[in-house]
């Protein structure tokens, strides 16, 4: 029996105009925004660390947002099954905006566009990282914001 199980959970897709408010929330929380894709091995390797942060620090006012740069044609074949397989609990959104010359520098002036990339911010304090994290490194960065 080869019935295909269709992933029915809602996957919100944003362009930059839709994403921009989500990466500039003005409240007391520490916001962690990670840009990743299922085809990016270093991204996949560090996803459990973001899940750990989400699980461990959500009660301390830390909010994790995973922004997938997977191609739209792969949402059903790769992204949704990946989220289901690894039981991702953090909020995942898909980002689809072909105007890279606009949104890459808008997200951060020093960003080359390479992933993984992460923004951690709280109010006006903002850090941008174009690199991978170990679990320990990511936790240290979060704790710096929570001080």
Where in this protein do the model-derived segments appear?
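N-terminal targeting signals for export/organelle localization
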Residues: 1-13, 126, 147
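A short beta-strand-turn-helix
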Residues: 10-31, 54
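Loop/turn elements at helix/coil->beta-strand transitions in domains of secreted/extracellular proteins
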Residues: 26-31, 60-63, 88-91, 123
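Short pre-active-site segment immediately N-terminal to redox-active cysteine/selenocysteine motifs
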Residues: 29-31, 36-39, 71
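Short, internal strand/loop/helix patches
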Residues: 82-115, 123
């Amino acid at each position: 029996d080869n019935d295909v199980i269709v992933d029915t959970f809602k996957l919100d897709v944003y362009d930059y105009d839709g994403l921009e408010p989500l990466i500039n929330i003005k409240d007391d929380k520490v916001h962690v925004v990670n840009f990743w894709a299922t085809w990016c091995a270093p991204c996949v390797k560090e996803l459990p660390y973001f899940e750990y942060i989400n699980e461990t620090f959500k009660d301390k006012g830390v909010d994790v947002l995973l922004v997938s740069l997977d191609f739209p044609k792969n949402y059903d074949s790769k992204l949704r099954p990946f989220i289901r397989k690894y039981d991702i609990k953090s909020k995942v959104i898909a980002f689809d905006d072909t105007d890279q010359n606009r949104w890459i520098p808008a997200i951060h002036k020093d960003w080359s566009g390479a992933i993984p990339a992460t923004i951690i911010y709280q109010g006006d304090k903002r850090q941008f990282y174009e690199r991978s994290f170990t679990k320990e490194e990511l936790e240290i960065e979060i704790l710096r914001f929570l001080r």
